[in-house]
Amino acid sequence: MEADAKPVRHPQRHLNPKMKEVVRKEILKLLEAGIIYPVADSEWVSHVHCVPKKGGITVVPNDKYELIPQRIITGYRMVIDFRILNKATKKDHYPLPFIDQMLERLCKHTHYYFLDGYYGFSQIPVSAKDQSKTTFTCPFGTFAYRRMPFRLCNAPATFQRCMMEIFLTFVKRFVRFSWTTFPSMVPLLMIA
């Protein structure tokens, strides 16, 4: 936290019935997974709102029969507005990889492996002393995160640091082994 940071409590936002149902389902899912827990009070309270999930693009004719590209909305996603908390947070400047540099390094190779973490950020626990800062309010109560949520300013850097600590030895050994010996899935299968 920045030295001059003052806690802020946002009031609950009004949600229409459709958005309220989206929030209810997400809250139940997060509670069941143990990612959040109910809290009675906190100095820091953020509010929730819903944003559209974009599914793709379609083309729709307008009044003049011109074809206009339009985004398809497949549903809504609950998000927490951590902007005030993020302003008060001391920034972590851990280097994040640039996608173009990663692609340049990979373009020479014929085999690629992809690891996908289920709820990636949520695999990382939030420090007990900082959990109250992740508190949010919604029509179903006030909750705090046990696990790192999206939209915290330091979440990407923290996640990258953890992944590098976990996989650095594996990546160095695997990359050297697979690219020089067997450019196939054999090393990946042996490790699994």
Language model features with spans:
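Retroelement reverse transcriptase polymerase core
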Residues: 1-192
